[in-house]
């Protein structure tokens, strides 16, 4: 279950827009919340904002390509995107 603080954080990230689009020079793309899973509970996982294209697209997204191919294709890691978005929303 999400806390009020988690919901506020997720809302702030979604308002920022897709962090990968931002990195590519396209600011403000509507975003969904992507949980970075490294074991443990999903509710405890760090999250990044990704647009539907980069989140769920068949051959363009983290879920469509898998993490390793996604990171290779876009020359960045989930952790690097997390660090970037946290810097930008502060």
Model-derived regions: residue spans:
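Helix-loop segments that flank and shape redox-cofactor active sites
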Residues: 31-39
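Intrinsically disordered, low-complexity cationic segments
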Residues: 33-34, 53-54, 62
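Divalent metal-coordination and catalytic microenvironments
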Residues: 13, 35, 51
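A broad, low-specificity signal marking well-ordered, structured residues that form hydrophobic/aromatic
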Residues: 31, 48-49
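Polybasic, low-complexity binding patches
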Residues: 39-48, 56-90
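Short cysteine-rich loop/turn motifs with clustered Cys
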Residues: 3-32
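Cys/His-coordinated zinc-binding microdomains
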Residues: 22-23, 52-55
């Amino acid at each position: 279950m999400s806390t009020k603080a988690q919901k506020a954080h997720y809302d702030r990230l979604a308002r920022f827009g897709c962090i990968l689009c931002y990195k590519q020079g396209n600011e403000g793309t509507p975003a969904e919340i992507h949980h970075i899973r490294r074991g443990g509970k999903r509710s405890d996982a760090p999250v990044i904002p990704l647009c539907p294209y980069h989140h769920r697209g068949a051959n363009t997204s983290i879920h469509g390509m898998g993490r390793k191919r996604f990171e290779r294709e876009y020359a960045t890691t989930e952790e690097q995107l997390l660090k970037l978005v946290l810097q930008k929303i502060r």
